[in-house]
Amino acid sequence: MEAGGERFLRQRQVLLLFVFLGGSLAGSESRRYSVAEEKEKGFLIANLAKDLGLRVEELAARGAQVVSKGNKQHFQLSHQTGDLLLNEKLDREELCGPTEPCILHFQILLQNPLQFVTNELRIIDVNDHSPVFFENEMHLKILESTLPGTVIPLGNAEDLDVGRNSLQNYTITPNSHFHVLTRSRRDGRKYPELVLDKALDPEEQPELSLTLTALDGGSPPRSGTAQINIQVLDINDNAPEFAQPLYEVAVLENTPVNSVIVTVSASDLDTGSFGTISYAFFHASEEIRKTFQLNPITGDMQLVKYLNFEAINSYEVDIEAKDGGGLSGKSTVIVQVVDVNDNPPELTLSSVNSPIPENSGETVLAVFSVSDLDSGDNGRVMCSIENNLPFFLKPSVENFYTLVSEGALDRETRSEYNITITITDLGTPRLKTKYNITVLVSDVNDNAPAFTQISYTLFVRENNSPALHIGSVSATDRDSGTNAQVTYSLLPPQDPHLPLSSLVSINADNGHLFALRSLDYEALQAFEFRVGATDRGSPALSSEALVRVLVLDANDNSPFVLYPLQNGSAPCTELVPRAAEPGYLVTKVVAVDGDSGQNAWLSYQLLKATEPGLFGVWAHNGEVRTARLLSERDAAKHRLVVLVKDNGEPPRSATATLHVLLVDGFSQPYLPLPEAAPAQAQADLLTVYLVVALASVSSLFLFSVLLFVAVRLCRRSRAASVGRCSVPEGPFPGQMVDVSGTGTLSQSYQYEVCLTGGSGTNEFKFLKPIIPNFVAQGAERVSEANPSFRKSFEFS
């Protein structure tokens, strides 16, 4: 656990010591180049491609760039040639001042893979500055009593060049009284001193004028001159003397303006005006005069402006004390500027890699450098980012860092990161700087479209119009852009016999489903298929969902009368004995409806009758029965019209016409079971009742047929009016087949009637149905209960 914590801290917080680390951090020695100052923009420094051992194309492909400290770019890199060029004219004096050698550090940043190459450019000084005196004229007062060999300080000149091009020596115009010496300060700057060679005589020559020349070591040399005006004075025995020849003082850089930082003091043993002392800067530079102020009476040295350790960390100020007689003394004040933590750390961003693909692994997102102009602990810097981000900081060469992702990101969870890099120094108080980097995560097609439902159920009423919008499917994709654009399609059906392409279509853009043709519930009640949703990513991802289409029934089929047949042939006459009791079953109207549900619920009613009140129709099963006792007064022929109506909205109907013939002496037939019946006596009573009921209805019908045949054979006078009863064979119309199994019972019948005088037996046989699909439910139950039951009855 502790090891993990240490590793985390290494990733999250890095301490940077602002020291020159050298080329070892880069893994190789620094490459060194040189160029003379004042070269024009575009000057060729070196061919980096050759020095790095890379082809020009490879240099460009790796995104090579030059990174310098600060925001000013002194160099440019040509990706066409691989040349390192100057981006501007370089002024060595502006960049480095008196520092020698003048070195500019820069890095070559290469990516894919990330690589730093540390480089140095030395700027060679050219002799482009002449020595310049701070004062063009110097006024000296020298006592006539001054002894030969006396050294008199003079104001120095300044040359901004360095090395041999800097100021080298001083000369004066030849004369018999003076010569000049060239001295060097501790910092290497040279200053002149005037040496008296011969005593002066004011009566002989009260004033002298000399030319002081400062020469540098350039080729050709440059020079600067100043005029020295010397006035020979009468005797002033004592010159002012400072209490200290050298004052050293340390001053904080944030010391307030007008603060007294040091007080110099000098004394003069003379009296009167010769003993009165005034203080002044001795040939001070413009920078010193802008920074300090000297009280001429008290010797207090004050600040005129704030000090800046990062710009100048020390000053050497020469002070002159002069009495009223013109004699002077000299002292030097060394001001050491003490660094204060007054500069916050700075961050310079070199490159940002954004956006990055969400599936990328450990990836460099940004390269940046940090710096602090302060020194010591004030210049030590810590870098950190928030702990809850999937990134870490990785130190690179010198003061460079890389911001690296820990692994693959998820754009669908978070598509943008605002990363705050905090850099803090170790000064007191600590100063910090925050820098925000926005990293965008680009989408990768890693999410398949997802339907809002696993399956969809759509309801369509039959007889719809073609191109009817029957419903929609919808899928969404968590990706973005083209990776989230979904295209819908119909997948091949699992049932090869389903003509899906002629039934429905789908809009590829929005998932709307359309019926291509009118659907028929009686032909197709339901079907299912699968739809696919595919995105436009590469590679494309897809998903699928199940769609069930349920066709709703419409009342588009009228009832169809199976019996009695209504095909325009000779009507079938039902025979009823006049002795029949009320409720006697005359016949049964059998009808079917091709619809389903309540659209197929049929009801029956007697619409017309020759003699109202004699017959009635049961509303639910179509049975026609006698309503009262028959009498001799009732007509022999009756015509009944039965209305068959379904329960749809609006209802549909059909009519059946029945012909009933009342006959005399025709009694209720008795139909005993055949001899094989005792073997079935053990059957369930309920089954027997069902069989007997079915046999009774069939026997009544067969009996009527036999009677009709007998009358025809006897050629009675009433045969013409009765006619022959025949039931045509053959199947009923195919459109009435109940494909759902939920419609009205549909059954065709065929009867064979055998009635002969000498046969010795009377049999009524149920023959096999012409259309096997129409099987009466009641008959199925009888067949299942006793499949060996013989469908034959005998008249007694």
From Swiss-Prot:
GO terms for biological process: calcium-dependent cell-cell adhesion via plasma membrane cell adhesion molecules; cell adhesion; chemical synaptic transmission; homophilic cell adhesion via plasma membrane adhesion molecules; nervous system development; synapse assembly. GO terms for cellular component: membrane; plasma membrane; synapse. It holds the Pfam family Cadherin_C_2. Its main location: membrane. InterPro entries: Cadherin-like_dom (IPR002126), Cadherin-like_sf (IPR015919), Cadherin_C (IPR032455), Cadherin_CS (IPR020894), Cadherin_N (IPR013164), Protocadherin/Cadherin-CA (IPR050174). Residues 35-133, 138-242, 247-347, 352-451, 456-561, 568-671 form the Cadherin domain. It is found in: Cell membrane. Keywords: Calcium, Cell adhesion, Cell membrane, Glycoprotein, Membrane, Repeat, Signal, Transmembrane, Transmembrane helix. Coiled coil: none annotated. Residues 27-690 are extracellular. It is a single-pass type I membrane protein. Residues 1-26 form the signal peptide. The chain crosses the membrane at residues 691-711. Glycans are attached at residues 169, 418, 436, 567. Residues 712-796 are cytoplasmic. GO terms for molecular function: calcium ion binding. Potential calcium-dependent cell-adhesion protein. May be involved in the establishment and maintenance of specific neuronal connections in the brain. This is Protocadherin beta-3. It comes from Homo sapiens (Human).
